[in-house]
């Protein structure tokens, strides 16, 4: 449910920013807000607190951010407060980044392997993914010891499973079809 809400808010903000040709600036401003909320957890708690009134929360927001960010982003933050969605800010920001990257024809991908990939292999995989997807792929490597071998790539809503386990399962299915 929270993911769906985050996508809706992110999409609405992105549409406004895109129409104004400011979606990259808005991305930077949201990153600024996210970093401040991360560094100052007490601020984050104040904005989420049911003890603090909505008016006080808006005043806190105004004092800290009004001169630092555009009116569009500031008003967006106020809307989040009005709708009691300030706790969803980080998820909304993550969804917004995905939309902004798509607007720049970029996509983030993760290569999950049992051991760290060397930079050369990571670069080769990144180039191949970029060529096959037609997008600029930003690839990072994550380690998962449960991966026996090979690589599992998560790119947007696609999963490319090149792991040994997937290949063994595929071979098993083929053998079962022959036997039956």
From Swiss-Prot:
Q: In what way does this protein cross or attach to the membrane?
A: Peripheral membrane protein
Q: What is the scientific name of the source organism?
A: Alkaliphilus metalliredigens (strain QYMF)
Subunit field text: F-type ATPases have 2 components, F(1) - the catalytic core - and F(0) - the membrane proton channel. F(1) has five subunits: alpha(3), beta(3), gamma(1), delta(1), epsilon(1). F(0) has three main subunits: a(1), b(2) and c(10-14). The alpha and beta chains form an alternating ring which encloses part of the gamma chain. F(1) is attached to F(0) by a central stalk formed by the gamma and epsilon chains, while a peripheral stalk is formed by the delta and b chains.
* Keywords assigned by UniProt, alphabetized: ATP synthesis, Cell membrane, CF(1), Hydrogen ion transport, Ion transport, Membrane, Transport
The UniProt entry, under NCBIfam families, shows:
ATP_synt_delta, PRK05758.2-4
For this record, the Gene Ontology CC terms, alphabetical, are: plasma membrane; proton-transporting ATP synthase complex
Tell me the domain of life.
Answer: Bacteria
Q: Which InterPro entries match?
A: ATP_synth_OSCP/delta_N_sf (IPR026015), ATPase_OSCP/d_CS (IPR020781), ATPase_OSCP/dsu (IPR000711)
Query: Where does the record place it?
Result: Cell membrane
Whichever gene encodes this chain, its name is atpH
Q: Which family does the record claim for this protein? A: Belongs to the ATPase delta chain family.
What is the name of this protein? ATP synthase subunit delta
Molecular function via GO: proton-transporting ATP synthase activity, rotational mechanism
Function (record text): F(1)F(0) ATP synthase produces ATP from ADP in the presence of a proton or sodium gradient. F-type ATPases consist of two structural domains, F(1) containing the extramembraneous catalytic core and F(0) containing the membrane proton channel, linked together by a central stalk and a peripheral stalk. During catalysis, ATP synthesis in the catalytic domain of F(1) is coupled via a rotary mechanism of the central stalk subunits to proton translocation.
Record's SUPFAM superfamilies? N-terminal domain of the delta subunit of the F1F0-ATP synthase
Q: Does the keyword Protein biosynthesis apply?
A: no
Give the PANTHER family listed for this entry. Answer: ATP SYNTHASE DELTA CHAIN
